Amino acid sequence: LSTVGTVTEIYDYLRLLYARIGHPHCHQCGLVVKPQDITQIVSSTVDLCVAHPEYTKKKGTRIMILSPIAKNKKGEFKELFSNLHKKGILECRVDGQILKTNTTQTLFKNNRHNIEAVLDKLVIGSVQSKPEYEKQRLTESIERALDISSGEVIVSIVTDPSFSFPDNPKQLEDHLFSQNLS
């Protein structure tokens, strides 16, 4: 289409037509992408958490609320991390890894980076939590994310076991303090 479209000069018209009448869809889930207000985002998030395969009524679904700060941008971003820490944001997800904002981050200035501020980590739908408190906290976190990133929010379901925070942690044992583990 691009060669034919360019040669016949119809490409610009097709692009304009698709932009006006087209409906963008999510490439992962197939749902139509459209603007939503905060209550719709909260409702969709809760529905997504309950429908997630790792959801159980006892444990719920663990999520992180993220605010995109830099998308595919080059730089070291030292000042950005400092400013985020001053605003009370303690963690960022940088290129998929969670990093603290108060430590000196060394990013390659010639590489492109994706940086998202971690605004909240919470569990949706567990038996210990109260639904009205969950919704209020989720709403506040999403509002803050939308304010910081000018209308965008990322809700990430945490399935990585390294993010596990057990209710009943294991007891400390002497072999955990072995020099072989250091």
Please place each PLM-identified region on the residue numbering.
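Cys/His-rich Zn2+-binding cysteine-cluster or related metal-binding knuckle/ribbon modules and their
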Residues: 1-110, 120-182
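Long, non-coiled-coil amphipathic alpha-helical linker/lever segments
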Residues: 115-118
